[in-house]
């Protein structure tokens, strides 16, 4: 089935493509445009976010018309009394949707309309069917009773001649009425469809027609027998009689109307808000007869009073307000009021009942409600989980003493603080669970694939062996002896600084067996690499130098292997040296749980010498025996490849080169793969010797070309059916990693520390850009540098890291952020050095990792603000006080220790107590001459400025602040 495109989904959901793209981005999906295709799970999520619509709005009109279709329409037997005014504007729109009238009725309506102005007096007792002669305009309708109160439901047609002829407004034509439409005809003829637009019906002569009063509670035709001739309940209305409205033969207020045939009775009613009765145009006030409508000046009557209830005929209905039309459109009732949905009512109730924190209402949990959040989530993500307003969560967080924005990535500690306040248990999804959920969204379940593999599809695979140990214990040289190569000669400083993967063949018991070796660094900075090597291996070979013994990295490698639950083979190296002691090594490793077989344990120890090529075959035999005896190594070759990226680097001619280890399946040239945030199609594969490989089977390490970027060492890779799927997985992984990094870098600023940070100024920060030859070395260097701690005054921040030569973009970034570029086994590209010199960017290059660590640590210490300490200069005893009107009190003193310096800091001590601190020696004289300093054993005169509280026997101590060297 073809995958849907964004614009197709937008059309299906009744939204624009821009809204669909925006919603997909909110859901974490990245699409390039409206023509991009999306996966079925993504389309399902979008359909859930936007329920399919498009028919709901048009369906409202037929629903509104439904009651009117079953009501009998009046027969247009007579004309409207004398209506000659300009055509009504609203009628033109309705006429287009009205049915054509009968051919025989149209001439009658036209003839009746022409005779209407000739009428001079109302015709009493004339039947509606014979209403060709109508009353003259302006004739008072004093004897006409008011139509009775409306009752819901269909009404019977009034009998002909039941009402006296009286000029009355036509129902359903009031522009201010809440509902428009015609009621039943007086002739009793039933009409199944809407009233023809070109036909006019005759009104009841001599009586005002209902449905035309803008102040009436109910609009529409009323039953003819509901209130004929009888007095209105409650007595006549005050205000005097009212003559027939002058607008009966002319235009009515609000919407001018001509004597043209009425149109559009079956069409939709005019929309727009209903005006207030107080805004209606004024009407002539006169004495109204019994049963007539009240004058506007008398004011509308509220429901519950006389004339307000059903049957009262006038005023407002008992339920108050202008109501819906009864009679003309079936069942009537009170005015149409917008009813809130149950969901809206529930949300309002929750908001009203939610406790207020910091002045805002936020939904609270019961203390056991679990909320799962991804790494680097923001307050918007948390608000979406608990159905709250993100701005309210910002207010709550400020109330708790934390400052953050709605879209800022927060760490787990901040979410735990917020969750504890609101009654939620926050669970931040681990990277493994996040990766599994990401793949499941693309219908990729690695665990289910492993469980579905049967014995018939499994095939034996070679063991993967990781060589681990302390630095300079001979791991790489041992591999050189196994492979008959000289890899160690190419290592800087003689130490391995990246992972190497090789596959060799050896003959064991007459059979050729393949073994895959992974060489890991032994330096302490490469802890992550050793842990990564232990995770992908089947057997660990622990190399220990016989002359050096067990070292810290030996114990660390041992712990990594035991944590990964892999069997260990110990290779005691350098046994050819005179001071070698293999038995000592066996005894030391026994303390860590590795008991040799000769001591009754289950760990194989082999004494080897990589330099002398001693016992290499015995070591290979031990590896194969361990694999056959303790492990059952099988994999499925007939499926999409799965594996791990061992190492990656950026080659100048070939681009991103990634060394991958296939764990299951078969990787072929042309497959679409994704490794971490890198994706692409396999263009070529090479083995460790540089030979071309067409297909890589399980446990085979190969170099892959064709990835978009350089993945990180340790990223898992998998082959997909389509490159589009690989790209989407990579983009989601990149977004998740970016959010996690932002949350990790966020410096928590509390309200208490905010003022202090502003007062102290910005904290000194050393920005670094790290470029290396391989991604594993860059990762190790970054981790080691971030562990340097010289105090809170100076911070280290890595603003960019990458693989490959230093480019102009790196220099430009360093210029903007005042950063230092560190190159690890790389050199700058062409003309980059000149640009760096011109911009004043410092670049440092290293080939050994611990040299870079030492220099960066020294630079950080140099950025520390100096510390000062108080150093005592000397003391002087006051032996006599000289009082001067010009200079104040002068102390005649004898220097007992050190020296007294002019303008130095001083304090006055009396009987062992400090009388005054932070004094300054303003004047210092030796006899009558000014002196800069006076040393021990001499007398002098000391003036302490404006401080005159000195006595004989007081001690003057002088001191100064000196910079203290930082450790």
UniProtKB/Swiss-Prot annotation:
GO terms for cellular component: cytosol. Residues 34-363 are annotated as: Disordered. Its main location: cytoplasm. Residues 573-576 are annotated as: G4. InterPro entries: EF-G-like_DII, IF2_II, IF2_N, P-loop_NTPase, Small_GTP-bd, T_Tr_GTP-bd_dom, TF_IF2_bacterial-like, TIF_IF2. GTP binds at residues 469-476, 519-523, 573-576. It comes from the Bacteria. Residues 519-522 are annotated as: G3. The keyword Cytoplasm applies. GO terms for molecular function: GTP binding; GTPase activity; translation initiation factor activity. It is found in: Cytoplasm. Residues 334-345 have a biased composition (Basic residues). One of the essential components for the initiation of protein synthesis. Protects formylmethionyl-tRNA from spontaneous hydrolysis and promotes its binding to the 30S ribosomal subunits. Also involved in the hydrolysis of GTP during the formation of the 70S ribosomal complex. Belongs to the TRAFAC class translation factor GTPase superfamily. Classic translation factor GTPase family. IF-2 subfamily. This is Translation initiation factor IF-2. It comes from Kocuria rhizophila (strain ATCC 9341 / DSM 348 / NBRC 103217 / DC2201). The lineage of its organism: Bacteria, Bacillati, Actinomycetota, Actinomycetes, Micrococcales.
